[in-house]
Amino acid sequence: ANVLWLQGGAXSGNTMSFLNAEEPSAXDLVTDFGINVLXQ
């Protein structure tokens, strides 16, 4: 699955919340579920 993450000018903290997740971690999501993250 592909995930496109668009970051605008707002500082809502969504990116940091995603990266700091404990269970499942961002690394676990990418490796275990085969997710392709495309960040902008």
From Swiss-Prot:
InterPro entries membership: NiFe_Hase_small_N_sf
UniProt entry tagged with the keyword Oxidoreductase: yes
Keywords, sorted A to Z: Iron, Oxidoreductase
Gene3D superfamilies named in the record: NADH:ubiquinone oxidoreductase-like, 20kDa subunit
Top-rank lineage group of the source organism: Bacteria
Catalytic activity: 2 Fe(III)-[cytochrome c3] + H2 = 2 Fe(II)-[cytochrome c3] + 2 H(+)
GO molecular function, one term: cytochrome-c3 hydrogenase activity
Class of the enzyme per the UniProt entry, highest EC level: oxidoreductase
SUPFAM superfamilies for this protein: HydA/Nqo6-like
Enzyme Commission no: 1.12.2.1
S-S bonds: none
Cofactors: Fe cation
Protein name: Cytochrome c3 hydrogenase small chain
